[in-house]
Amino acid sequence: MGTKTKKSKDDFTLEAYNGIRRMFFLNEIIPGQKISYGDLAKRLNMSTTPVIQALKRLEIQGLVRHEPNRGYYTENISLSEVIEIYDFRELIEVSLLPDTISGMNKTKLKKLKKALDNHLDAVRDIFLKDRLLKDMEFHMTLAKLSGNRIKVACLKDLFDLLYLKYRGNILFVTPMEMVDAEHIQLYDDIAAGNLERAKHVLTHHIANVKHHAISSIERMQNEKKAKL
């Protein structure tokens, strides 16, 4: 029988980090909430040390904040931050298209087609979180095909903010048919090597998602004010 490898401190920290990220995505941790080290440690079945280390990493990403002598809190929803994230997304994603299209081949196009098909299949499903993940997968696959690792890493951080911090509160509001059509058109333009058309479609697509996200947040904020 083989011996079981003992987990290192880094292994436990990574496990805690991924576990907390999963709680964010599943809405088990909500915006503005005080985070209890002990509660998270119990739910993750580990000590508080790796949990605290994981929270420090999440603080760097902007998902939580630390208040001296009070502990960690999740950040509240910020309209200005959402606008900034989508603006930055547009800058990064559109800037990657020239390299993506110039380096396109049959193998890369097949990868993009698979990501597109996965998304189209997911949006027909009742599981909205799967739809969200497949949407991100399509955009990240497209970005990775450019070969620009630094910009791709920045884009991944932006998706983390959108999909973990804001989750279903604002990201399920764009009509599915609109997203489908825009993704299909974007794929077709990339397959045809039409850079200018692909830039136009991608810019328009991100602007549409941004518009619906802003409208959703403003509606939520107005409803909250009305209850006061």
Report residues per predicted region.
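Short linear motifs at protein or domain termini
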Residues: 1-102, 214-228
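Short helix-capping and inter-helix turn/linker motifs at the boundaries of alpha-helical repeat units
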Residues: 11, 110, 176-177
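Juxtamembrane/interface motifs at transmembrane-helix termini
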Residues: 52-53, 103-106, 130-132, 151-152, ...
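Mobile beta-alpha loop/short-helix "lid" or hinge segments that flank ligand
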Residues: 60-65, 158-160, 175-177
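Alpha-helix N-cap/N′ positions at the starts of helices
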Residues: 69, 92, 114, 178-181
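Conserved amphipathic alpha-helical segments that form helical-bundle/coiled-coil interaction surfaces
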Residues: 85, 97, 102-168, 181-188, ...
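C-terminal regulatory/effector modules of DNA-binding transcriptional regulators
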Residues: 175-228
